[in-house]
Amino acid sequence: MSYVPELKRHYKDNVIKELVSEFQYKSIMQAPKIEKIVVSMGVGDAVKNKKLLDSAISELSQITGQRAVKTKAKKAIAGFKIRQGQDIGAKVTLRGNIMYEFLYKLINLALPRVKDFRGVDGNAFDGNGNYSFGIAEQIIFSEIDYDKIERISGLNVTIVTTALNDKEGKALLSKFGMPFSN
């Protein structure tokens, strides 16, 4: 038998049954699941210093275990000296086993290392069961060597679920162990 991440096994063995009984689904296929996790990092100073973008890509790749891609500006913004199509950030889309491994690492290892951590905001859902939050420093991940980073920067994490509303999405993430503050 091949390797199955701990959170994926937990989802199949426990979470589905709990969600079906809690929300009175007729089938286990109606139970919401995590579709993908998108981790992104905006590097506004990449306009002046291309090395910052390369370091952001390598840091995201180290954190997630998957190669990051550059993101481009959708439109020009004169105030920030950004032209359309210019590289201004990086992102990684995680699916499958890598997604479950990252979620486990985020919930159990990285978030507890945040200074004065009291949980993530429970109201940051988008109305469709998807959850987004920001992390102020990338150094909370153990893969990042503090001495080798060029600058401390934050990153955004979006967890896309198949939940129909925020209540189902919050219940799903709570059962995975997401530490909500409210």
Swiss-Prot record:
InterPro entries: Ribosomal_uL5, Ribosomal_uL5_bac-type, Ribosomal_uL5_C, Ribosomal_uL5_CS, Ribosomal_uL5_dom_sf, Ribosomal_uL5_N
Functional note: This is one of the proteins that bind and probably mediate the attachment of the 5S RNA into the large ribosomal subunit, where it forms part of the central protuberance. In the 70S ribosome it contacts protein S13 of the 30S subunit (bridge B1b), connecting the 2 subunits; this bridge is implicated in subunit movement. Contacts the P site tRNA; the 5S rRNA and some of its associated proteins might help stabilize positioning of ribosome-bound tRNAs.
Name under which the protein is recorded: Large ribosomal subunit protein uL5
Cysteine disulfide partners in this protein: none
Matching NCBIfam families: PRK00010.1
Lineage: Bacteria, Pseudomonadati, Spirochaetota, Spirochaetia, Spirochaetales
UniProt key word Plastid: no
One GO term describing the cellular component: ribonucleoprotein complex
Gene field: rplE
Molecular function terms from GO: rRNA binding; structural constituent of ribosome; tRNA binding
tRNA-binding is among the record's keywords: yes
Keywords from the UniProt entry: Ribonucleoprotein, Ribosomal protein, RNA-binding, rRNA-binding, tRNA-binding
HAMAP family: Ribosomal_uL5_B (MF_01333_B)
GO biological process, alphabetically ordered: translation
UniProt cross-references to Gene3D superfamilies, sorted A to Z: 3.30.1440.10
Family statement drawn from the similarity comment of this UniProt entry: Belongs to the universal ribosomal protein uL5 family.
Self-association and partners: Part of the 50S ribosomal subunit; part of the 5S rRNA/L5/L18/L25 subcomplex. Contacts the 5S rRNA and the P site tRNA. Forms a bridge to the 30S subunit in the 70S ribosome.
Pfam families in the record: Ribosomal_L5, Ribosomal_L5_C
